[in-house]
Amino acid sequence: MSCKVGFWRQDVAVLCDWEIKARCDKNSMVVPFDPELLNPASLDVLLGNHLMIESIFSPDLIRVDISHYTEEEPYRLEPGEFCLAETVELFNLPNDISCQFVLKSSRARSGLNHLLAGWCDPGWHGSRLTLELKNERVHHAQMLYPGMKIGQMVFHAMSNVPLKSYAETGHYNNHLTVMPNVA
């Protein structure tokens, strides 16, 4: 498809629950797709099994498997600590849909912060979303475990298909786990 330069459609919008479901059912936009995670204008996403954390011994982030942690015995993100995390869900955005990650308000109110790199361009595919998380609390750890609701994705219908899709130009396609900077 090509973009019609100079043509403006008035139907640009955030997708509602039934539109998200239809896209996921038809195009595998989110895998796995659980309709129980639908909200009126977003889809909840879950924390995956891998983190990347800082080490005092190396400037590089170290990959950590947290699959054995549970709600009863969670991973502790200590005060001021930063980590990269991943979603359980794999995303396959068509060329006419973009999306944005937003931290669940309950997580934000507990002092967890997402550091604002949550935009996903049309055509981004075959990848789990990497999250940049920081514990903003001073005295208490944040408890993290696989499968917890961490945020929600808001999907945007594009006014037109872009001239260049992220499928052609993106660095972060086809990444099945948390990814550090590859630019």
Predicted regions and their residues:
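DUTPase catalytic domain/fold
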Residues: 1-183
